[in-house]
Every structure is written in C-alpha cells, then in structure tokens.
C-alpha cells in the first residue's frame, strides 16, 4: 500500500512539474497585447500595457529558463522548435520592456553593441543572447533546417514578419509556420511584383538568410516559386514566378518599433 502511494505521489509530482508544451501562459499574454491589422499581415504590440502587466511574461520566461538540456533533448523535434521560437520572441519582448520607450530595437545598447548579442537571459543551462538562439541553435545546419522560422521569430520591428497573437506549439507547428509565412509573403508592402522593371521585390530577410532557402529548395527563386500566387493577382505574372523568369530584388527594411 505504501509503495502504491509513493508511486502515485511521484506520478502526481511529475505531472505537476511537466513543461506546458501548449505554452498557454504565453498565448494568453500575446492575445492580450498583440493586435493584427485589418489584412492580417502585420501586428503591433501594446508595450505600454505590457509594462503594466509584465509579471506573467517574467513568470513564463522563468519557466523556460528552468528547462535543462536533458529535458529539452527528450522532447520531439516539433516541441523543441516551438520552445525555441517562443523563447526568442518572449525574451525579445523582455529586452524591449527593459529599454522602453525606444524607437527601434537597434537603439538598445551602446554604439558598439549589437542588441542581439547582449547576454541577458538563461536558457538550456547557459547565459545566452538572442543571436545564439536563432543562429547557433535554430539555424544550425542539419538540426531543424526549417527556413520558415524566419517568419516566426520576431525582431520587434515593422519590417519583421508579424508576432502572432498566440504561442507556437508543437502539435500545430507546421500549420502555424505556414500561416505566418503566407501572411508575410502576401503583404505587398514587403513582398511584391514590380511590373515596371519585371522584378520580384522581396524583404531583405531573403538576402540576409538566402542560404537557408537555397538549402531547402535549391535556390531562392525555386523557394519563392512555391508561393507565386501570393505575389501578384495576375496569373501570367504568377506563372513567370513559378517558372523563375523574373529577377529578384530586395526592399529596404523598416526597423521602427512594432507598436
């Protein structure tokens, strides 16, 4: 009887401390502070309100920091990637709040500092900066090899793909990544076909991280061709993009704060 009781207590304790892969706390916070534009292609964050209600964010980030590498490594790949994307986005919010009010994330730090390389949080047993999460873990070749993460991680800027009003979760990760990708690509202010010069003009994200898209599809043009229908309403133009018969140019990036 005592053995059975101990087993039940252990099981109950394990369930109580199990990590929430639904990221419910983060979804609740995002739903309360993130708003979409009417087209559903851009979002803004109410940072002023978030500052006044910061405790839930700090508690959520603390729960992420408590996860060690052994626990992380035991998860399935989708849960790992969802965790990392949410960590990046959550700690980016914290970085903005720590320095608010600001006009741009690039204004954070001294003139010789890169805000993405400031070590200010603990994750997976290490003192980390944002670039580590994105470039050394998420983008590590052979690990996830998922170019759509570039439309999921949010740099708190107008030019960046939208911060969703929900957390990423492993059970729906593929659908969420695809939805975020399509929302960004169909935004004609950031990705569009320019008939005047017969050019597909896309976000600078594709210039900075072109290798990720090339690794996935063989070339950037081939990757963009998958989404030809989003860049133009003209079927002839869409076919040109599918057949990779358009040149590619890059638009300037808007680093203004996404508020």
Residue ranges of model-derived segments:
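N-terminal signal peptide c-region/cleavage motif recognized by signal peptidases
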Residues: 11-13
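Sec-dependent signal peptide recognition
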Residues: 1-7
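Sterically constrained small-residue positions within well-ordered secondary structures
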Residues: 7-9, 144
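Interaction/scaffold regions that mediate signaling and macromolecular assembly across diverse proteins
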Residues: 19-85, 89-259
């Amino acid at each position: 009887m005592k053995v059975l009781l101990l087993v039940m207590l252990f099981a109950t304790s394990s369930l109580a401390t199990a990590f929430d892969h639904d990221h419910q706390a983060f979804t609740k916070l995002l739903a309360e502070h993130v708003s979409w534009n009417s087209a559903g292609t851009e979002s803004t964050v109410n940072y002023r309100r978030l500052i006044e209600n910061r405790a839930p964010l700090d508690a959520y980030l603390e729960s992420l920091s408590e996860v060690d590498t052994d626990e992380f490594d035991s998860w399935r790949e989708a849960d790992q990637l969802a965790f990392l994307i949410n960590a990046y986005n959550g700690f980016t919010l914290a970085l903005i709040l720590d320095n608010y009010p600001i006009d741009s994330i690039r204004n954070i730090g001294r003139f010789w500092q890169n805000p993405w390389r400031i070590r200010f949080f603990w994750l997976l047993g290490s003192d980390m900066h944002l670039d580590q999460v994105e470039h050394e873990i998420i983008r590590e070749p052979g690990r996830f090899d998922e170019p759509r993460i570039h439309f999921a991680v949010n740099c708190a800027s107008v030019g960046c793909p939208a911060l969703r009003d929900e957390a990423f979760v492993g059970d729906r990760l593929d659908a969420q990544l695809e939805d975020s990708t399509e929302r960004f690509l169909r935004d004609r202010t950031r990705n569009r076909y320019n008939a005047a010069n017969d050019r597909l003009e896309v976000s600078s994200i594709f210039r900075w991280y072109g290798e990720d898209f090339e690794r996935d599809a063989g070339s950037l043009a081939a990757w963009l061709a998958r989404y030809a229908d989003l860049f133009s309403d003209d079927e002839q133009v869409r076919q040109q993009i599918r057949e990779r018969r358009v040149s590619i140019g890059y638009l300037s990036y808007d680093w203004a704060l996404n508020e």
